[in-house]
Curated annotation (Swiss-Prot):
Cellular component per GO, a single term: nucleus
Family under the similarity heading: Belongs to the protamine P1 family.
Keyword Cell wall biogenesis/degradation attributed: no
GO-annotated molecular function: DNA binding
Protein name (Swiss-Prot/TrEMBL): Sperm protamine P1
Alphabetical UniProt keywords: Chromosome, Developmental protein, Differentiation, DNA condensation, DNA-binding, Nucleosome core, Nucleus, Spermatogenesis
GO biological process terms held by the UniProt record: cell differentiation; chromosome condensation; spermatogenesis
Localization terms from the record: Nucleus; Chromosome
Expression sites by tissue: Testis.
Purpose of the protein: Protamines substitute for histones in the chromatin of sperm during the haploid phase of spermatogenesis. They compact sperm DNA into a highly condensed, stable and inactive complex.
Length: 47
């Protein structure tokens, strides 16, 4: 399964992987929504 991490933008995720590692994980859809609401971050797939 692909692991998800929360990042501010997808472009940053693809370019800088380190920025994603420190962010929280978001596997399920609930986690993805919580990232957007609480931290106002978007989830990116690869890190």
């Amino acid at each position: 399964m692909a692991r998800y991490r929360c990042c501010r933008s997808r472009s940053r995720c693809r370019r800088r992987r380190r920025s994603c590692r420190r962010r929280r994980r978001c596997r399920r859809r609930r986690a993805r929504r919580s990232c957007r609401r609480r931290y106002s971050l978007r989830c990116c797939r690869r890190y």
